[in-house]
Amino acid sequence: EDGILGGGELNNHIFCEILHKRGHVVRRVHSHELTRDIIEENKQEYCFIIANFLNIKPDVISAIRNLTRYVIYEHDHKYLKTRNPALYEDFQAPADQLVYHDFYASALAVLCQSSMHKDIVEKNLKLNNIHSLSGNLWSTDVLDFIEELSQGEKKPECSIMESNIDHKNTSGAVKYCILKNMEYDLIAPSDYKKFIKRLSQNESLVFFPKT
């Protein structure tokens, strides 16, 4: 995984906690720190769960594919150059836009977040190892916190997540609010609970992700 605390990373954290509570030994490695030596040392004892591989070096990806048992926990569409299937008719990208096909094909399983997510991945990669988890993972603590926030007073503004990541599409949300003459509040990512608390202080959220 990577060190950035976003939705995918929080989901990874809960997933690891569940595995740990069920008696499994979990070793976490940031994607950019994964090496061939780490793979070689652990390939017999561990099954690798790859949640983010964009910062893994190509030779290390080859080592994973050829030497180890691994599962891909897919949070978006990293098999596409654009990572955005919505750009293409019926969510099906041209063949020249596909990447990492062999990496997905060699996995024991590719775990997707929903049945729609699974269908889109399957449509593009044409593989039979793709599965839907039917949702994301949440801790009881976070769910209780969100329920508590839902009861608070709201300002008549729109929350917009401030991000320079292209597929978060902050500019699209701002343009929409300006077009509709809606007041908005740009909220920069921070500590997770502080961030969702800030989001919850407004009546609505405007978000047009590109993936």
Task: List the predicted regions and their residue ranges.
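N-terminal pre-catalytic "stem/leader" segment of glycosyltransferase-like enzymes
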Residues: 1-55
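Short amphipathic alpha-helix with an adjacent loop that forms part of the alpha/beta core around
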Residues: 36-44, 60-63, 198-199
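Active-site proximal beta-strand in glycosyltransferases
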Residues: 47-49, 65-94, 111
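Alpha-helix capping/helix-boundary segments
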Residues: 55, 78, 116-118
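Membrane-proximal helix-turn-helix segments that form the acceptor-binding/catalytic region
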Residues: 89-110, 119
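A short, active-site helix/loop in glycosyltransferases that binds the activated sugar's phosphate group
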Residues: 105-130, 169
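Carbohydrate-associated surface elements
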Residues: 116, 135-139
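Conserved catalytic-core segment of nucleotide-activated headgroup transferases in glycan assembly
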Residues: 138-200
